[in-house]
Design a protein with these regions (language model features):
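Alpha-helical transmembrane segments of multi-pass membrane proteins
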Residues: 108-123, 148-173, 192-198, 361-375, ...
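Membrane-interfacial loop-to-helix junctions in multi-pass transporters
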Residues: 31-33, 68-75, 103-114, 147-156, ...
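Hydrophobic transmembrane alpha-helices of multi-pass small-molecule transporters
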Residues: 1-83, 202-212, 219-330, 446-451, ...
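Hydrophobic alpha-helical transmembrane segments of multi-pass integral membrane proteins
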Residues: 104-137, 329-344, 355-394, 398-399, ...
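Juxtamembrane transmembrane-helix boundary signature
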Residues: 75-96, 122, 129
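Membrane-interface helix termini and inter-helical loops of multi-pass transporters
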Residues: 54-66, 188-196, 285-289, 343-356
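Flexible loop linkers connecting adjacent transmembrane helices
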Residues: 19-23, 59-64, 89-105, 140-151, ...
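Membrane-core helix-loop-helix motifs of multi-pass transport proteins
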Residues: 138-232, 424-457
Length: 464
């Protein structure tokens, strides 16, 4: 008698489980916490730049030091996003709505797929929402499942939420495609005009690739659940009570007009309405354009309108303030790394090398892989495009490659390695309370499988 046939899906599941186990063990053993990793990356960037460019050690240190403060406006924006999003999730009816949404998936497998899809969809709307709301949803689902007595693996929920971010640069807030569609952008002369979003973000090949990529990572996330014995549930206590139930800093209640103002709803509501008027006017004038500033002011207006008083809002912000500390500590390190790579010309050197080895059909794919490599050192879509774009657009002009494919190839590479980057994952770690190695071990699996639809989409668009 012949050997019994093993179903193909069983073989695939066994392979994924073994691969996941190996990756988790590797990350657990070799992946330090993000601040330590940032120091290691800094030293590595210094050594690489010193070895591969004419810059001497003094030049490298100066480039690093000059870069440290380059992201301060961005750091402030991200900190405010974290602060407002955290507060918004704990004010008024929002916790109940989040809980209702978190109750949609009924099984652990459905939860892993749901949070991946949710994070991917909000990432397509605006990239700041991907890691913030994705992390909040992962946490809320974990709490919901614990209340219902259903075991769910919290690290996988976090990794799945982060993996949904793999499509952000294909969406509405994609830096590179929006820049080349904007009048007066630095690449306009090189492109011979503007490149409309109908040829990049809204192109058929990009829309199809979005669907295939999200479907791939969602399906794979649903297969990665560990055995019952290995499940790690969320450990934190329930903290979704309104801020008014949290012990107040002032144990002695003040009297008079000061107390009335601090506890008056009309005060925060008035400012919230004024701010919301500005937000509506902004969208009316500029259309549905999302950036960090308008996202922050929209969140802040919502917080003001939902808060019962300035006292309640202050208490919630005080709780949220602890979540901002890791961002303030770690982001300057990556700003320094960007300074090294940009100010010494090392990134332009890398981009130029990759651009020279391409052919008409292969150049978009090379842009994709080189974009992934460069993003590890410059995790900023706009900055990366500014450095990498000129070399690849020049090569595309010579080879006759469609510039839209170059733009999206670099965008795909940027978002591809974002989901394994300790810098990018910080907001999600803050929202979930999970350690980096547990989240990145799962998102690394998604990084591997996302290669197929992302690269495949570019290949299909190049040849067909």
């Amino acid at each position: 008698m012949g050997m019994p046939m093993v179903p193909a899906d069983t073989i695939i599941n066994r392979f994924l489980q073994r691969l996941t186990g190996a990756v988790i063990r590797g990350f657990d053993r070799y992946m330090p916490e993000p601040f330590a990793f940032g120091i290691v990356m800094t030293l590595a960037a210094m050594v690489l730049t010193y070895s591969a460019t004419p810059a001497d050690s003094h030049d490298v240190v100066l480039a690093w030091g000059n870069g440290l403060s380059s992201l301060l406006p961005f750091i402030t924006q991200v900190c405010l996003t974290i602060l407002f999003a955290y507060a918004l999730a704990h004010l008024g009816p929002v916790p109940r709505y989040l809980e209702r949404l978190a109750s949609v998936p009924k099984t652990a497998r459905a939860a892993y797929g749901f949070v991946t899809l949710f994070a991917g969809c909000v990432s397509l709307i605006a990239w700041p929402l991907g890691t913030i709301l994705g992390g909040l949803m992962a946490r809320q689902i974990a709490l919901s499942f614990r209340r219902r007595g259903i075991p769910v693996h919290y690290p996988l929920l976090g990794g799945a939420a982060f993996s949904g971010f793999v499509v952000w640069h294909m969406g509405y807030s994609g830096s590179a495609p929006l820049l080349v569609a904007t009048a007066g952008n630095p690449m306009e002369v090189l492109l011979g005009g503007l490149l409309p979003v109908t040829e990049t973000i809204l192109s058929t090949f990009n829309l199809v690739t979005i669907v295939l990529t999200l479907a791939t990572v969602t399906i794979v996330a649903m297969q990665l659940g560990p055995s019952s014995a290995e499940i790690e549930e969320i450990q934190e206590p329930e903290t979704d009570q309104p801020a008014s139930s949290v012990p107040q800093e002032h144990t002695i209640r003040r009297v008079g007009i000061a107390d009335k103002l601090e506890n008056a709803r009309w005060l925060t509501t008035t400012l919230g309405l004024i701010l919301m008027t500005y937000v509506v006017s902004w969208f009316y004038v500029k259309g549905v354009q999302l950036d960090l500033n308008i996202v922050n002011w929209t969140f802040f207006a919502a917080c003001l309108l939902l808060a019962r008083s300035s006292s309640e809002l202050t208490q919630v912000f005080m709780q949220a303030g602890r979540a901002v500390v890791p961002t303030l500590l770690q982001y300057p390190l990556y700003a320094g790394i960007m300074g090294i790579m940009l100010n010494t010309g090392f990134v332009a050197q890398i981009a130029g090398f990759f651009a020279r080895i391409g052919t008409t059909e292969s150049l978009p794919l090379i842009a994709f892989f080189s974009g992934g490599v460069i993003n590890l050192f410059i995790p900023s879509g706009g900055a990366q495009w500014a450095v990498q774009g000129p070399a690849f657009l020049e090569a595309a002009k010579v080879l006759g490659t469609d510039p839209a494919l170059i733009v999206m190839g670099i965008a795909y590479g940027d978002q591809w390695t974002n989901i394994i980057h300790p810098f990018v994952v910080i907001p999600l770690l803050i929202m979930t309370g999970l350690p980096a190695n547990k989240v990145l071990s799962y998102s690394f699996i998604m990084f591997l499988v996302a290669t197929l639809p992302l690269a495949g989409g570019l290949i299909a668009a190049s040849y067909f």
